[in-house]
Amino acid sequence: MQELRLVLILVGALAIAALLFHGLWTSRKETSSKFGKKVDIDFDSESEDEQPTPARGFEQPKESVVDVRQERKEPAFGRDEPNLSQDPLFDGGTDAILKQNAEEKEVEPKVIEEPIMTRPSISESMVKEEPTISFSAIDDVEPTFHKESSVVPAPVEPVIIPEIEPEVVPEPEEDVIVINVHGMGNERFNGNRLFNSLEQNGLIFGDMAIYHRHSDLAGSGKVVFSTANMVAPGHFQVPEGEEFSTPGISFFLPLPCNGEADYNFKLMLQTAQLVASELGGNVLDEKRNMLTPNKIDEYKQRVKVFCN
């Protein structure tokens, strides 16, 4: 935009200069032409004066000579303009001519306006508008300094994220796995024979007058499972071994137990099967039914709940 403005200013200045030059040149030309007309008139009058007079030998009619002399007045040798009022040709028109000459002097020279070459207009849609930056506006604007806010920000309270407590898994209810060993038919187990079989399989007579299997064979470790009399009150009469007899015994594993529950169950099942084999009895479940593989799997599922 700035460059276009400068170009238009230069073109306008050149056009004005051209018009002024043309006007001066035209006025001088008209002035010189006026002076040329005056010189022609003077030279014509002088030429008339310098014409040779007719020789005396040639006779002309006197009337014609007299008429010419009377009609024409000899001009003086000076540069004065001829008196046009005495000429019959300019009679009555001298005033108009003088008036016209005066008007021509007063009339200013006509200025012939030359066509200015204008640049083709370009539509606004064709011209990409560029942002105009006014440097004067930028220079005049003084930077404003904002005072720091005196407002003290409110203290931000720390966000307390509640600790997610681990979900407490409820401990399974206590359970007891029971395996019975019963004599064949109505047969009963003899006390001494029974006690010897139990002791050979790692059980030790102890608390509550029953046999216990400890975590170690010495009997100093924790109790893993126990064996009681099937008949109430459930204890054994060891001193009366020869006289004591029972239809069967019960192995029981309390859950949870000391050590690994699945290992303790396998050990109790194996001990019950060995005692039943030695005494000639049958291995029964808690309801005194024959212990089947399906019942064994059920026992294992119950024990698995207590495995760590």
Curated annotation (Swiss-Prot):
Membrane-crossing residue ranges in chain numbering: 6-26
Keywords: Cell cycle, Cell division, Cell inner membrane, Cell membrane, Membrane, Transmembrane, Transmembrane helix
Taxonomic superkingdom: Bacteria
Main location: membrane
UniProt-annotated location(s): Cell inner membrane
Region (Disordered): 43-90
Periplasmic side: 1-5
Protein's membrane topology: Single-pass type I membrane protein
SUPFAM superfamilies: Cell-division protein ZipA, C-terminal domain
Stretches of the chain forming a coiled coil according to its record: none
Bias kind Basic and acidic residues: ranges: 59-82
InterPro entries, alphabetized: Cell_div_ZipA (IPR011919), ZipA_FtsZ-bd_C (IPR007449), ZipA_FtsZ-bd_C_sf (IPR036765)
CC per GO annotation: cell division site; plasma membrane
Membrane topology, Cytoplasmic segments: 27-308
Record SMART domains: ZipA_C
A Pfam family: ZipA_C
GO biological process: division septum assembly; FtsZ-dependent cytokinesis
Role summary: Essential cell division protein that stabilizes the FtsZ protofilaments by cross-linking them and that serves as a cytoplasmic membrane anchor for the Z ring. Also required for the recruitment to the septal ring of downstream cell division proteins.
Family the UniProt entry places it in: Belongs to the ZipA family.
Subunit structure: Interacts with FtsZ via their C-terminal domains.
NCBIfam families cross-referenced by the UniProt entry: septum_zipA
Record protein name field: Cell division protein ZipA
Encoding gene per record: zipA
